[in-house]
């Protein structure tokens, strides 16, 4: 089989139609999957030694949230280094990053795999991956035909990257024209609320306005602050962080503004405060609503006049600091209650941002779950960590009162539990590995630190013993019934139990 002119024209047309780059990329991937008759296709962007999925077809939705590092995925590293079409043999020992991620075929391994690196000049900017479940699925397509596909995709991706950078430079006039991508903090999410937030971040980052970031606990307000700073003209200067809720009143003023030697007992030398450290940069004040009224007055003066006084010093110091503040409180209500100064509130909230709670972000839950699964896979040295369809449905049906932080902890705990239930480094997370109850949500966060402080092998074995013992008790001490409950082969269960000291 070879590509006809009509097929190539169709691919080119798909790259010119659609609203926005994302739509065009999705049309490209869907068309390629149909034309090449493959089981899965993906367009990936290369950034900071990792591949970031931009569009997928035939793969689980959580793939869009995963970040595939070169170190963790040898096939993708091979594609990145190749410079040309890569065909992996059906019996390749290199694990495929999409094994277990093709819906309806979770238990099957990917057999046929082609990688097309995408270049802008000599620079790698991305890759196309084509996967099939039959070993000879792509044998009828020549390398020359695949290079034509790669050339079309490279042009489309490069144009999108150039437009993205030009738009950013138009917002910030005077920036040097340089088309070299710099990795920034990434906010994962494609829901309308998150897309709107990203747009607002892009707008306000280019200015020097103070920003008040509101949102529930665990939504990612610090990540928003980092994104604003990194996209701002101040990005080359420091971003200094201060948690106002953790400041004892006795040292709060010194932490903010510094002190001179002898200002108080224990002040044995001059010390710069956070404002001085952030000079020409950005100061992020987390939990701003916890500051006392006295400190609020002094903070207001800095915002008004741009000068500070160290504790114990009569001299003023000029500082040039952009302030980003975050709170999980309703500061308007705090103003009405007399707990927060109205003038400070108006100074801080020149451009307010609101981070949506996870329960309002729809499918973003699955993307974030994929991101955390990939993190766990790398940290624990596993070959793969995938979510079963039931697990995805379970995550989508939960309300997430603890937001993204709770999801992260829940995924980490589920990975440990899922690994304990089976042999090997292939981990499949099922709904039963989650204990998601609104009233019990804090318990997830409380349990994880204890696990993290233990030796990983010992913690895993302890979970395995606990689960096997419980399953035996619930199944009348029948090893066969226990194996069925744990979804294990009974012979493997006997071997595992013997290794764990549960059998003689």
Curated annotation (Swiss-Prot):
Name of this protein: Anaerobic nitric oxide reductase transcription regulator NorR
Cross-referenced PROSITE patterns: SIGMA54_INTERACT_1, SIGMA54_INTERACT_2, SIGMA54_INTERACT_3, SIGMA54_INTERACT_4
Task performed by this protein: Required for the expression of anaerobic nitric oxide (NO) reductase, acts as a transcriptional activator for at least the norVW operon. Activation also requires sigma-54.
Domain of life: Bacteria
GO terms, molecular function: ATP binding; ATP hydrolysis activity; DNA binding; DNA-binding transcription factor activity
Gene (name only): norR
DNA-binding region(s) from the entry: 479-498
CDD domains assigned: AAA
Pfam family, one: Sigma54_activat
């Amino acid at each position: 089989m070879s590509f006809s002119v009509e097929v190539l024209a169709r691919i080119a047309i798909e790259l010119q139609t659609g609203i926005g780059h994302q739509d065009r990329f999705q049309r490209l991937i869907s068309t390629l999957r149909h034309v090449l008759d493959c089981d899965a296709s993906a367009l990936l962007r290369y950034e900071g030694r990792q591949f970031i999925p931009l569009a997928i077809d035939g793969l689980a939705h959580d793939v869009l949230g995963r970040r595939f590092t070169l170190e963790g995925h040898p096939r993708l590293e091979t594609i990145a280094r190749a410079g040309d079409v890569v065909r992996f043999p059906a019996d390749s020992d290199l694990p495929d990053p999409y094994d277990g991620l093709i819906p309806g075929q979770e238990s099957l391994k990917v057999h046929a795999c082609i990688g097309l690196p995408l270049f802008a000049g000599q620079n790698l900017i991305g890759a196309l991956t084509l996967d099939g479940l039959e070993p000879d699925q792509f044998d009828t397509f020549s390398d020359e035909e695949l290079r034509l596909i790669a050339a079309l995709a490279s042009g489309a991706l490069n144009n999108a990257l150039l437009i993205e950078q030009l738009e950013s430079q138009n917002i910030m006039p005077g920036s040097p024209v340089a088309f070299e991508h710099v990795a920034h903090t990434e906010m994962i999410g494609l829901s309308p609320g998150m897309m709107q937030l990203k747009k607002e971040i892009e707008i306000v980052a280019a200015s020097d306005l103070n920003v008040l970031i509101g949102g529930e606990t665990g939504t990612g307000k610090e990540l928003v602050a980092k994104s604003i700073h990194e996209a701002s003209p101040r990005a080359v200067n420091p971003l200094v962080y201060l948690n106002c809720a953790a400041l004892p009143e006795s040292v709060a003023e010194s932490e903010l503004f510094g002190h001179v030697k002898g200002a108080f007992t224990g002040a044995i030398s001059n010390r710069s405060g956070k404002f001085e450290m952030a000079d020409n940069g950005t100061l992020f004040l987390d939990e701003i609503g916890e500051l006392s009224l006295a400190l609020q007055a002094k903070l207001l003066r800095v915002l008004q006049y741009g000068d500070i006084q160290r504790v114990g010093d009569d001299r003023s110091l000029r500082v040039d600091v952009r302030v980003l503040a975050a709170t999980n409180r309703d500061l308007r209500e705090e103003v009405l209650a007399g707990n927060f100064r109205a003038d400070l509130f108006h100074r801080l909230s020149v451009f307010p941002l609101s981070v949506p709670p996870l329960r309002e972000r729809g499918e973003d839950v699955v993307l974030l779950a994929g991101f955390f699964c990939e993190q766990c896979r790398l940290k624990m040295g596993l070959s793969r960590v995938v979510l079963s369809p039931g697990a995805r449905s379970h995550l989508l049906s939960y309300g997430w009162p603890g937001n993204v932080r709770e999801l992260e902890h829940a995924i980490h705990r589920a990975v440990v539990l899922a690994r304990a239930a089976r042999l090997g480094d292939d981990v499949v997370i099922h709904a039963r590995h989650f204990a998601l109850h609104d009233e019990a949500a804090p318990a997830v966060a409380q349990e994880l630190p204890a696990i993290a402080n233990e030796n990983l092998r010992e913690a895993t074995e302890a979970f395995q013993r606990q689960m096997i013992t419980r399953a035996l008790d619930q199944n009348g001490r029948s090893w066969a019934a226990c194996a069925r409950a744990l979804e294990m082969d009974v012979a493997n269960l006997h071997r595992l139990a013997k290794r764990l000291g549960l059998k003689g």
